[in-house]
């Protein structure tokens, strides 16, 4: 069991994360290795070394991004299973054991995901992740059957190490390197297991919530990411006939919707002048024109205006 923990800035929440790891049921600590990539002033790494023998620290002040930290740590990963978490993230005490049971039972499953909540004090109570799956008829999710059940968040998702290490995060993507990494794995492995009985609590808001974008005063996120991230993802996802998987189409709409969601916050309004806004609107129109199916997203569901042709299902 291998955990990657990037430290890009000093954070006093590290001990919370390490405590939740040490409290896992029926998992011996000698079977867990936590690799911390510390790009800070070494304070956080010292906290880890002083508290738990399962922690190893790489001091890498040259690391500037989440993608760089993950790539560095992944190159040194050992063990059968791997996940990533940030300072302040915690796991329910049955998380590791439940994931391992799935991997042992279903040998072809590439990764396991669970229920997610944001526990940042900016919210009055734990806030449920919008893309939580809830109670499903089957814990095995096939994205060709259920394209709205994409798994976007890299943190808290347990992968088979050999699969995780066969991909590399794109450190040229300033904002969506984790989404790109997760989706490219799902293009090759469209089935995974979702467990509603395990819980991952993350400290920092993520892309389903407008708080993630406060303050998102970076114009390149509105424009450059469409060209540098979404368009290459779309082109790489096409099959021989030029068809785009429906779950990638779902993500396209989700991604563009979040940009409008972010702009609902007063800090982001008037971030672009009229000419810049016109460029963004034209770019998102060009991206959406690549869609083969019209998707309408609501807070709780997805509606399709047409049924896309499904490729053969690969059963596990």
Q: What do these predicted regions represent?
A:
Residues 60-77:
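Glycine-rich, basic loop-to-helix element that forms the pyrophosphate-binding segment
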Residues 1-4, 33, 180:
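Cell-envelope/extracellular polymer assembly enzymes that use nucleotide-activated donors
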Residues 163, 167, 173-198, 204:
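A short, conserved alpha-helix in the catalytic core of glycosyltransferases
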Residues 82:
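Short aromatic/hydrophobic "clamp" motif used to bind/position activated sugar donors
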Residues 10-25:
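Short, well-formed alpha-helical segments that are part of the catalytic scaffolds
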Residues 21-59:
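Acidic donor-binding segment of Leloir-type glycosyltransferases
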Residues 90, 94-129:
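Conserved donor NDP-sugar-binding/catalytic core segment of glycosyltransferases
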Residues 127-149:
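Short, flexible, basic/aromatic active-site loop/helix in glycosyltransferases
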């Amino acid at each position: 069991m291998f955990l990657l923990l990037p430290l890009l800035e000093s954070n006093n929440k590290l001990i919370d994360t390490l405590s939740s790891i040490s409290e896992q049921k029926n998992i011996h600590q000698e079977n867990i290795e936590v690799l911390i990539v510390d790009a800070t002033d070494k304070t956080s790494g010292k906290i880890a070394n002083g508290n738990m023998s399962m922690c190893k620290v790489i001091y890498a002040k040259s690391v500037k991004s989440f993608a760089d930290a993950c790539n560095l740590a992944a190159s040194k990963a050992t063990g059968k299973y791997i996940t990533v978490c940030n300072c302040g993230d915690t796991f329910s005490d049955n998380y590791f054991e439940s994931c391992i049971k799935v991997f042992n039972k279903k040998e072809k499953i590439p990764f396991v995901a669970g229920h997610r909540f944001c526990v940042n004090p900016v919210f009055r109570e734990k806030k449920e992740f919008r893309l939580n799956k809830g109670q499903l008829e089957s814990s095995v999710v096939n994205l060709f059957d259920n394209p709205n059940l994409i798994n976007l968040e890299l943190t808290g998702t347990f992968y088979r190490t050999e699969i995780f290490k066969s991909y590399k995060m794109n450190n040229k993507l300033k904002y969506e390197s984790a989404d790109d990494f997760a989706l490219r794995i799902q293009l090759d492995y469209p089935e995974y297991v979702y467990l509603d009985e395990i819980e991952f609590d993350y400290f920092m808001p993520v892309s389903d919530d407008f708080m993630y974008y406060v303050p998102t005063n970076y114009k390149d996120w509105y424009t450059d990411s469409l060209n540098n991230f979404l368009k290459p993802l779309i082109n790489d996802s096409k099959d021989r006939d030029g068809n785009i998987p429906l779950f990638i189409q779902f993500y396209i709409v989700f991604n563009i919707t979040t940009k409008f969601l972010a702009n609902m916050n007063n800090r982001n309004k008037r971030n672009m002048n009229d000419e810049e806004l016109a460029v963004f609107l034209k770019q998102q129109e060009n991206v959406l024109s690549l869609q083969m199916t019209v998707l309408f997203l609501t807070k709780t569901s997805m509606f399709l205006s047409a049924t896309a042709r499904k490729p053969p299902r690969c059963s596990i």
